[in-house]
Amino acid sequence: MNTLFNGKLAAMVLALSMVNISAAYAQDENANAKEEGNRNVMLNAASANGPREIQIGLPSADVNVLENGLPVTYATNPHSVNTIWRGDASLSHQGLLKIAETAITTGNIGYAVNSFTQKGQKGFNGTLNYKSNHFGLQEFSLNMNGDLGKDWFYSVNMYQDFDPGTFKIKSTPYQDRTQIYKALLTKKYNNERGEFTAMYKYANSHNVYNYATQSAPFIYVGDGSVKEYGKFKLGTTSYLPIDNEMTYRDMRTGKLAQTTLYDACLNKASEVTLMNSYRFDNGLNWKATLKYDHSRGAMVYQTPMAIVDLNSADNHGLYNYMYRDIDGQTKAYNGQYVQTRMSCLNAGTIDEALFTTELNKKFKTSTLRLGLNEWFYHIDYCSNTTMYDQSVPADGSYAVRVWDANLRSGYFYDFNKNASEYYKGSENKLALYFTHDWDVTKKLNLYYGARVEWQRLKGENAAVKNAQGNFVGRFAYYHLGAMAADGTKIAPVDLAYNWLNYDFSVAATYKLTDNFGFTGDFTYIVQHPKFEAFAPATLPNTDKISVPLGRAGIYYNNSWLSLTSLFSYISKTNNNSTLNLQHGSEIKAAPLAYDIQTWGWTTDAVAHPFKGFDFHFLFTYQKPTYKKFETSVTFNDGYVGKINATGNIVAEIPEILIELDPSYMVTKDIKLWTSFRYFSKTYANINEAYYFNGHWETFGGVNWQASKRLSLGCTVVNFLNQTGAKGSIAGAELITKDEAKNIKNQIMTGSYLRPFTVEFTASLKF
């Protein structure tokens, strides 16, 4: 999990919702009735291969993606969504579930991508999708389905991704090498009232992009802008060292081992899904889905920490950095800067069994639904961490690993000292939920629902206490069986928890006239920490996590305009996090639990002013602030690093967001479209010391239905060719506003905007 604060508050939107609220909560067979519109969920400025993360003014959490009504993965660390799911030809439907629907059916807060696998249809049907870009991406997706006679149907799918990324790295030709296979067999029975489907899926993925694109150097000017560091091009120059080998100390055994970064990020999944639906004579509909998955999940991070200026007067004579040249000869490093990085090798063996069943029935003026979840998750997980140093080349060449000969004779050091993790055991959630969508009168629609959930954790972790009852924390060469300086032996610690969680949601829409009305909704969720929260060296705050979300406003619809404007409030208590605070070359972990609250106002409009032209506009103002955000840590030299961010704007979340999405049908077969997203100023550290100016994310393209069976497309990502940094700045958590005033034109590292990219797509139906 490695809850590095600078990677977890990924930022975007308070409440990107609100279109066609009057139809928001119908619970019929049409999946769109439970979904949002106009979200462009697959237009992702952060990634070329996954769904866009739509935030709601809270810290980033698990991305909710459902396939056939079940989560694609129970927990996204260490098994990320993109390694086992893609928006490819294997899917018959993709949408975005509303916040209330996600809360009631899954117990999570936020939007969820809702997808369904393509089942067999009568006759023979095929879809072949192809995608490429000017960097060399080759992506293929194939679905073939048909009938076998006597109400038997089949569907087979293949997905292949060969993505070199936007810059070349030495360790592998691909930053994403993913293959996914699916096979389905369906039987309709009892005069097609019932349908049973068995599906097998296998996925194999190396998500190199997760660490290859994690950071890059730039010059922070001091006014919210950045400029390039020498010839280093943000987004098109690699910042990874040439060497692909990694030495680590196994958290479980204590033995030194070697791997490659490519092998360390191998993800594999083998899963079986059974689906059944049945329509009874009395109008009652029943569906049930069961999935078992056995997998290896892995996430690799190469997190930047301190940058040392060797030319600084304060550092003169302190360091003696060396490197090995292409012939293996040891030579003195004469560059100006050295970057310290923390390598985190996260991996776990996972077994999960997820079962969901629902009954629903339509009445004259309402629809009633009753559902049950039984979700079981077992994992054996650890994160092995290693520190190393590398060069920071200004000429755009590949970085090399270096070591300080005054301290050590090799590249790697401080094994498992920082952010190493371990937990093993199971998490089980048993939940019962219901929803009722009721047209009380012709003018008033009422939707309400509730969920009651029993959450049980049982297993072990490495949050070890000494004889005085204090957590030992991590130290160099930490592992199970190691001995701390005070004589405490590191041994697994048993843990067991039982919690009652609950959610409820209510929404009302009142039509004052045929075109104008009022709308509002309120969702309240009570959760407790997930198993992954027990991975660090200390126990998390196990108090309840409460998330209230309320919205109220107006809507107006006519023949050419649909407009909604709402005020929103959302908050969340007891966010568990671990800050890896840095002082000089030392890193200390500081766990804390804090609250967040966000007020906001959103206006969303969809207009069709003339034939062929559509325009979507969204404006959001929000003010997300920290509450109860205080922590401190004492470093080895006696320095006490303190943070009090209470009242500060949440890092990485903008206060103003704008979306502009015009499109025009040039002919009945050719569509031109663009999408503009504006993100205002964001703070790049917790203390509001560093910040990045606002920026636009832009997309544009043309779609051509060349024939009945062939469609072609061209998309340009970042067509304004904006370059720059975003997110947070590595190692900057303790920097204050007063200190930052004097920091100008200084080299730093962080994440960056996706570079200008031209993509080509083709889809053939046969």
Where are these regions (language model features)?
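Structural signature of Gram-negative outer-membrane beta-barrels, strongest in the C-terminal barrel
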Residues: 350, 367-377, 382-386, 390-573, ...
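Acidic/polar loop-and-plug regions of large Gram-negative outer-membrane beta-barrel proteins
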Residues: 173, 186, 195-273, 298-344, ...
